[in-house]
Amino acid sequence: MGAGSVWASGLLLLWLLLLVAGDQDTQDTTATEKGLRMLKSGSGPVRAALAELVALPCFFTLQPRLSSLRDIPRIKWTKVQTASGQRQDLPILVAKDNVVRVAKGWQGRVSLPAYPRHRANATLLLGPLRASDSGLYRCQVVKGIEDEQDLVTLEVTGVVFHYRAARDRYALTFAEAQEACRLSSATIAAPRHLQAAFEDGFDNCDAGWLSDRTVRYPITQSRPGCYGDRSSLPGVRSYGRRDPQELYDVYCFARELGGEVFYVGPARRLTLAGARAQCQRQGAALASVGQLHLAWHEGLDQCDPGWLADGSVRYPIQTPRRRCGGPAPGVRTVYRFANRTGFPAPGARFDAYCFRAHHHTAQHGDSEIPSSGDEGEIVSAEGPPGRELKPSLGEQEVIAPDFQEPLMSSGEGEPPDLTWTQAPEETLGSTPGGPTLASWPSSEKWLFTGAPSSMGVSSPSDMGVDMEATTPLGTQVAPTPTMRRGRFKGLNGRHFQQQGPEDQLPEVAEPSAQPPTLGATANHMRPSAATEASESDQSHSPWAILTNEVDEPGAGSLGSRSLPESLMWSPSLISPSVPSTESTPSPKPGAAEAPSVKSAIPHLPRLPSEPPAPSPGPSEALSAVSLQASSADGSPDFPIVAMLRAPKLWLLPRSTLVPNMTPVPLSPASPLPSWVPEEQAVRPVSLGAEDLETPFQTTIAAPVEASHRSPDADSIEIEGTSSMRATKHPISGPWASLDSSNVTMNPVPSDAGILGTESGVLDLPGSPTSGGQATVEKVLATWLPLPGQGLDPGSQSTPMEAHGVAVSMEPTVALEGGATEGPMEATREVVPSTADATWESESRSAISSTHIAVTMARAQGMPTLTSTSSEGHPEPKGQMVAQESLEPLNTLPSHPWSSLVVPMDEVASVSSGEPTGLWDIPSTLIPVSLGLDESVLNVVAESPSVEGFWEEVASGQEDPTDPCENNPCLHGGTCHTNGTVYGCSCDQGYAGENCEIDIDDCLCSPCENGGTCIDEVNGFICLCLPSYGGSLCEKDTEGCDRGWHKFQGHCYRYFAHRRAWEDAERDCRRRAGHLTSVHSPEEHKFINSFGHENSWIGLNDRTVERDFQWTDNTGLQYENWREKQPDNFFAGGEDCVVMVAHESGRWNDVPCNYNLPYVCKKGTVLCGPPPAVENASLVGVRKIKYNVHATVRYQCDEGFSQHRVATIRCRNNGKWDRPQIMCIKPRRSHRMRRHHHHPHRHHKPRKEHRKHKRHPAEDWEKDEGDFC
């Protein structure tokens, strides 16, 4: 390559480099053309605690240019708020030319610390922070035509709350106050925290400790009893530093939540211990008071009281609404006593608020302790096989929902709820397949809900019956669909939106025969379930087993109370001590062998007069009647649903005792004689069993035909004890038959009491045909007296002395897609008691999307029962606690032993006026809430899609229970009831479902006509405006002149003729008034209602620009300007204010020479004629009435000189000022007159001279009472 080529190549390369450099310079010039550049921060929101200082960053850069040296950047900070769906910027400060102007409301709280030394640093320093400071802030920098901005988000954390000890108000020393805050996940608040909360509107008239050992409280609205050291001014009151041993409340400060607070609202409410257990099952703990306040601060809103870790019951309200504790947002507290002290009793039932930390940390005040609550573990098929249930010691109860109004269930069916009583556990074998419960605590109560199963034998889980296992059972659990807890919409507008945890429904495949255990009290039914059956070949159609067994006493305790000795069972039926026995039925061909079961019956306390009785053998133990149904066509297993009611006790009428009985030989196993009635006609009862064993004499319930009815005998239902042991066999036809040849009756004393129970519901699908019903209409019941307590002649027996009764449920059976071809029944045995008890009931069903028509009819002849319902919230959350007592209606004298035949008639049903409503039952059988009398429950299921209804029909003379009987409304509230639902009308100053919340009486503005309300301890007082009186300022004592309209103590008149502003004001003054002033939104609305044109008002800034004043010299308390007004738009000035009619009367400043209508305003209190003054007269025309603030002037008569002030004013009370003017003749004229008459020397007596020296009495002295 030649030298020329190299040179040319070098020139080409140089040219390319210059070209690139030129392009780069062009790009740099373009980049630097913009002289202002914002350095935006992208670090996320700025977080700071309450009452602290925070710096909101804002940085920008300036590129110096000769053309813009004179352009100085303007910095503006605003807060972005959303109002009416649109963003609005509230100005904070503006900085330019080394001058910083701070907007009103931010003065003393904001600054630019780096300005003006560092003009490019516009960081805003804000503090002490308030909770309302949270939000979005805009930093805007303007230089010439360039505009840059940045947004910064501020989050203020922490909340101040007042804490009161559980025992009383003002009960904490300084050390105890610090500890109370620590247990509430907070610290004791500092004075700056309380001041910041006050500036945000915190108002609480309770003195509390602060961190500097001072005692203070914040008051935004002064009222009697809350003045403190600031009189009637708002502010934080202070008692100064106090002795640490003095007692006050405390103000706590919670800084960070560090987790989530969630509401737990199960279908039935929880005790305090149950709430702890419920939270622990969800991997959380009960929330503390501070955590709930922080959650409320972050937006939690739930109108449902719930337990907290300190034992208090509170709930957070963001949006105030009716029946949620008052008109202001906040965390409400439920107090135990009317004086707003005390936490609810731990046994009371509420919902719960749980806290789950983001990182597992120990929570203050809620340590991990074994639960002793009322909630049992729920068996779930999702868990590992062989899961053991380990309940804590002590009996646990489940309270059924208090169905006092229709329930709206959302979600699917609810999982079973388990309760247990601790007893020795035994591990039993189980049939392979599916999860297995390795051990089950004895006396455990669970609710089974039936579901289709592929197993050969249906378990008690196919029946919606409350059952209680008396011994550990080895059970096979078949997997069932996961169910969710339903949520209810009840009183108080409460709607639960969350769903409970998914739990599994257990199904017990092979219940074994166990000795029964006592399990029922008055209105507290916990029947024992004990069955003995051998399973048929699983290839056959499934069997449905329904067993309701006679109860047997346990260790003499029901719940936490012991039974009286007079209610113990006879040793002739049950031994006080039964050793562990082993019962294994003989298997049938093709049947699976039932597992062996070992059981032990605890000792029963003996009566002092009772002789020792031998322990009976295994054959003497009470067994059960097994109700079996077969399906010959191999149809799948349909659910069996049943509901039971609590037992009720009454006396038989005297005429129902028939002593015509024939004794029969004793059975070797029976220690007592028995009889068989001669006139009893026993028909076969369809019970699916062919051979029955009678280990001792029993009584079997059977239909009885009655040929007469005594006038005293009402229609009642009683039943007999069943002591049969049945074994299953495949049989032909849907129903088996029971041979009554072995049926005998136990002896019954003539004054025996009869214990009845509400009839149950039994739904037994399983037949291929449709339609038809079967009802066991008449049953018998007997019981035996205790030995040693024979009935002496003449003695009386009351229902309280009944020792044992066999109670039957009378089902009306409807088959789902099948016909009922025989009646069925099963018996239970219960013990009456007057002890406080809780009615436990849960009902479940696996019916899918069916509508069930249920008709309930009450039998006659029931005694009056008194029910005292405990206090509580009426929402159907799962509890109904009642204390029942029975009035002894009549007693029967002692007679020899006799059997019992009861005449029966058809139950006469009459409508009770109960509401009838449409019920849609997606998958849950709704528990029935009836009265205290006997009821027969008929269930008719026509098809899976037929709509049904609830209708309650009553017969007899008993009145339904009145929920307002004991007036659950507190503080003088009035209870109103509608059936079983009640509501409270609260007196002034109280709110809440039961009027338990004491609110400010003045919140609802009780004072009328503009009166000022002042809240007091037990009421309020009204300070009335002039011309009003009465306790509520409801009395109008002064009126207005004709053509004027009165409003809140003033008179107003609208003048439609147009005048300039000055002329309008002059005309109003001629009428003893002024152009109207406006001091409240109510007054503005009243004035704006006069006309539909723009009108003058008395506001003006004619004296000082931008200093607006009213012409009546009242203060500027209220403003209602149009947007961007006042603006003083015209160069000549806009000094007068007009109400713009088409913009709802908003104000605008305009020139005063406009001709517009106007409104005059004057007072209602007027003064009479001015007082007369001697030697003086009024200037102008004398009037009959003068307006308040009107002035008059006196002038002296001719020849008299004026001394002192000549004007007086009409005061607000309608009286004139006392005149000060004095009119006196000059002394010179007297001397001249004396000198002129001197030659005559007409001397007068000295006495007359003294008389003339006295000044004459003036007229105004006579009217002394008219002056101030």
From Swiss-Prot:
Ranges of biased composition (kind: Low complexity): 575-585, 618-630
Gene Ontology terms, MF aspect: calcium ion binding; carbohydrate binding; hyaluronic acid binding
Specify whether Repeat is a keyword of the entry: yes
Q: How is it modified after translation?
A: O-glycosylated; contains chondroitin sulfate.
Query: What is the protein's species of origin?
Result: Mus musculus
The identity of this protein, by name, is Neurocan core protein
User: Which Pfam families does the entry link to?
Assistant: EGF (PF00008), Lectin_C (PF00059), Sushi (PF00084), V-set (PF07686), Xlink (PF00193)
The record lists the lineage as: Eukaryota, Metazoa, Chordata, Craniata, Vertebrata
Tell me, what does this protein do in biology?
Answer: May modulate neuronal adhesion and neurite growth during development by binding to neural cell adhesion molecules (NG-CAM and N-CAM). Chondroitin sulfate proteoglycan; binds to hyaluronic acid.
* Domain Ig-like V-type per the UniProt entry, residue ranges: 37-157
| Record-annotated C-type lectin domain positions | 1036-1165
Keywords noted in UniProt: Calcium, Cell adhesion, Disulfide bond, EGF-like domain, Glycoprotein, Hyaluronic acid, Immunoglobulin domain, Lectin, Proteoglycan, Repeat, Secreted, Signal, Sushi
GO terms of biological process kind: cell adhesion; modulation of chemical synaptic transmission; regulation of postsynapse organization; regulation of synapse structural plasticity
Domain (EGF-like) spans 960-996, 998-1034
Sequence ranges of Pro residues compositional bias: 608-617
Residue span of the signal peptide, if any? Answer: 1-22
Query: In which tissues does this protein get expressed?
Result: Brain.
Residues of this chain annotated as glycosylated in UniProt: N121, N339, S380, S410, N742, N978, N1175
Cysteine pairs forming cystine bridges in this chain are: C58-C139, C181-C252, C205-C226, C279-C354, C303-C324, C964-C975, C969-C984, C986-C995, C1002-C1013, C1007-C1022, C1024-C1033, C1040-C1051, C1068-C1160, C1136-C1152, C1167-C1210, C1196-C1223
Please note every region of biased composition (Polar residues): 419-430
Localization, per the record, is: Secreted
Q: Which residues form the Sushi domain?
A: 1165-1225
Basic residues biased stretches: 1228-1255
Give the SMART domains listed for this entry: CCP, CLECT, EGF, EGF_CA, IG, LINK
| GO terms under cellular component | extracellular region; GABA-ergic synapse; glutamatergic synapse; perisynaptic extracellular matrix; plasma membrane
